[in-house]
């Protein structure tokens, strides 16, 4: 195969086995020129194995780009909140956690406008009515958020 879908492939495994599986996936990727769609909630694994990242909220992409760009400079408020929950390797290091509040919409009956607006601390009136279009922020980094609408 040229394309493999990996849906939470290491989520229930112990850390040592996870590392072995991830290393095997990378080795196979290099030797066989494979492309993976790697679906995971473990952001440290995503950062380690991915070249490109897509962050999804309620079934839709809110931000895409090169892994190093997304992790260094998350733009969408959901991506920022998600990344603020990643544990720091240094126990003395501090990170401001962004706690999401508000109602979690039903995927079967999503709200009008931006699907994240019910939980977004930066919600504007337009967010409640109009779904944002993807904005290219340069070098393939795209974000769906009215905060980045062109003036």
Task: Tell me what each language-model feature is.
Residues 66-151:
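Short catalytic/signature loops enriched in Gly
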Residues 1, 5-95:
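P-loop NTP-binding/switch modules centered on Walker-like glycine-rich loops
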